[in-house]
Curated annotation (Swiss-Prot):
SUPFAM superfamilies: FMT C-terminal domain-like, Formyltransferase. Keywords: Protein biosynthesis, Transferase. It is an enzyme of class 2 (transferase). HAMAP family: Formyl_trans (MF_00182). GO terms for molecular function: methionyl-tRNA formyltransferase activity. Belongs to the Fmt family. This is Methionyl-tRNA formyltransferase. Its EC number is 2.1.2.9. CDD domains: FMT_core_Met-tRNA-FMT_N, Met_tRNA_FMT_C. PANTHER family: METHIONYL-TRNA FORMYLTRANSFERASE, METHIONYL-TRNA FORMYLTRANSFERASE, MITOCHONDRIAL. It comes from Lysinibacillus sphaericus (strain C3-41). One of its GO terms (cellular component) is cytosol.
Amino acid sequence: MTSIIFMGTPDFSAPILRMLHEEGYDIKAVVTQPDRPVGRKRILTPPPVKAAALELGLPIIQPEKLRGSEELQQILSLQPDIVITAAFGQILPKELLDAPSLGCINVHASLLPKYRGGAPIHQAIIDGEKETGVTIMYMAEKLDAGDIISQRAIPIELDDHTGRVFDKLSMVGRDLLKDTLPSIINRTNNRTVQDETQVTFASNISREQERIDWTNDATTLYNQVRGLHPWPVAYTTFEDGNFKVWWATIGKSKHDTIPGTVVAIAKDHFEVAAGNGTTLALYDVQPAGKKRMTAEEYLRGTGSKLQIGDQFK
């Protein structure tokens, strides 16, 4: 029986771990990030992969930093035939990459060589891509640069957001690995070198990328809002406070005013001027110091004094 060490952290990875267990693979250990404080009360919370591993009765290793750690030596001592990673969150050191006889395999949420890096789903939606997918690949020292074993594409629908695509790709990754792993174990799999001329990157989202620039047109802003939904969430500023925009659509109004200006107010939304005469219609918001609410709730309460001509920056 092929022995596996699985490495992953978020919800994306948990169905993949469950599949490996259901298929009867010998999972020597599950490696995941340490428990972290979550929410306003900062409650120490295990990552989803740890929760799944506990449910399945699998050994768990949680290194703060893998490179040079005791946990790394523990992993190496298990002598797995293959290491499988899926959104683990740390770069694997060379001594681990070289250890398994079948190599280290990664389940990556993009159609490589496009969108190497830690935020491929966010970036594909922000960029307005019509398609994304999952790549099963051999791992190399260079981030997401290893040879491609298999890929599976899905469309990005116009109303998709990062959370929805994240869930879709988790299932795609699970199924693609299930279909691909036997050929890897039997050493009959395909292996394609990535075309370096086609490489694009998707680094972790920065605070600046979260900020709405109202001079961009409404399509660009809509892609930004849905690419950052439900985390980390796009924001603007209003009345000297950060104002989160959880959901918005392309507005119907046209304008010739300064971008960021409120140009229309309806019962369940309001429209803000964007670039090139377009508008963004805000439906789900969070004013500074308040909870998330619908635009209708905002306009009845905190935002009841919002007027046409008010300025978001």
